[in-house]
Regions:
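Hydrophobic transmembrane alpha-helices and their immediate loop junctions
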Residues: 1-328
């Protein structure tokens, strides 16, 4: 996803969320507009149709971003590219928060369904099909675009919204790691079906999208394997991540960013130094005001970890500094 972000240029900022457009969007836009040109009497109408697609995708991604913020997560960037949109969101690693952040995008499309249906029905009753055929065709096209985007996004194929919603629902019952593994396996099945569809339809675009999903499924599989290994680690009592409520693993799973030594951030931060609010490297004695949760990736001080674990720590608030890095 970072490669997508690198090739994008900024458009505008709304509600603290920066929106960017990938350069390849224009190439695909030109191609799609040329194809739709024959359905209209002037070039302006297919351009309007493609811009409507742009707007629907953008609203969908804003649904994800704003819902993520409601859960206490962070969301500050959206990029649009030929295969849709990507909202860079970081909700709390809890199934409920993840589910709402994911479902909010398709819910935007659901909200648009009656609006577009009424617009098409009004156009039909007003006789736009004969008096203003270009406008009526545009309304029909936008209605179908929204419906197709909704249906496609809800396919239970990871990392589409449907696949990630499936994972979030499974999370309630079988946990974070196993739910991801199941969603990824279902995703691989979906990729196989998409590849078959691409071959039968001789569609380059379906093949490209299948390749994109395959790469994400492979990445998800590797991450699920890491989560499964982490789930078996012994955990330190008395501390919990304020975001995902998971206790930190017991052992030297953090690496000092100064000397490179591996150490237990909670052992040195809680025992050797009288429950200080910072992690301290026992080798070079470097202080790290923020310690990363190896389960959800969020950064918190030892005091915040302790407070979430129902331990009272007497410490002043600390600024975030260069944190320790988790080992591979």
């Amino acid at each position: 996803m970072n490669s997508i972000r690198k090739g994008a240029f900024p458009l505008f900022r709304f509600a603290g969320i920066a929106v960017s457009l990938h350069w390849s969007w224009f190439l695909v836009a030109a191609y799609e507009i040329s194809i739709e040109r024959s359905a209209y009497t002037s070039i302006g109408w297919p351009i309007a149709e493609y811009l409507a697609l742009f707007l629907i995708v953008l609203l969908h991604e804003f649904g994800h971003a704003l819902a993520c913020r409601q859960t206490g997560g962070t969301a500050d960037y959206i990029v649009l590219w030929p295969l849709g949109g990507v909202a860079y969101v970081d909700p709390p690693q809890r199934p409920g928060a993840m589910l709402w952040s994911l479902a909010a995008g398709p819910l935007v499309n659901v909200a648009l369904l009656p609006v577009l249906y009424i617009a098409v029905a009004f156009g039909r009753s007003a006789g736009l099909a004969s008096t203003m055929p270009n406008l009526f065709h545009l309304l029909l096209a936008v209605q179908w675009i929204n419906l197709i985007l909704l249906g496609f996004n809800l396919l239970p194929i990871y990392p589409l919204d449907g696949g990630q919603i499936l994972r979030s629902l499974l999370w309630f019952g079988i946990g974070r790691a196993r739910s991801l593994m199941v969603a990824v396996v279902v995703g691989f099945v979906g990729v196989a079906a998409m590849i078959g569809w691409a071959l039968l339809a001789q569609s380059t675009w379906i093949g490209i999208f299948a390749a994109f999903i395959l790469l994400n499924c492979w990445s998800g599989l590797r991450y699920a394997q890491i989560l499964l290994k982490m789930a078996k680690l012994p955990r330190r009592p008395g501390f919990a991540c304020p975001s995902c409520q998971t206790a930190p693993p017991l052992g030297p799973y953090w690496r000092c960013g100064t000397c490179g030594a591996r150490f237990d951030a909670f052992e040195t931060g809680s025992s050797n130094y009288g429950r200080s609010a910072v992690a301290i490297c026992p080798n070079c004695h470097a202080n790290f005001p923020a310690t990363r949760c190896l389960d959800c990736g969020r950064w918190y001080s030892i005091a915040e970890w302790a407070a979430a674990g129902a331990i009272t720590v007497s410490a002043k608030p600390v600024d975030r500094a260069t944190p320790v890095l988790p080992s591979a």
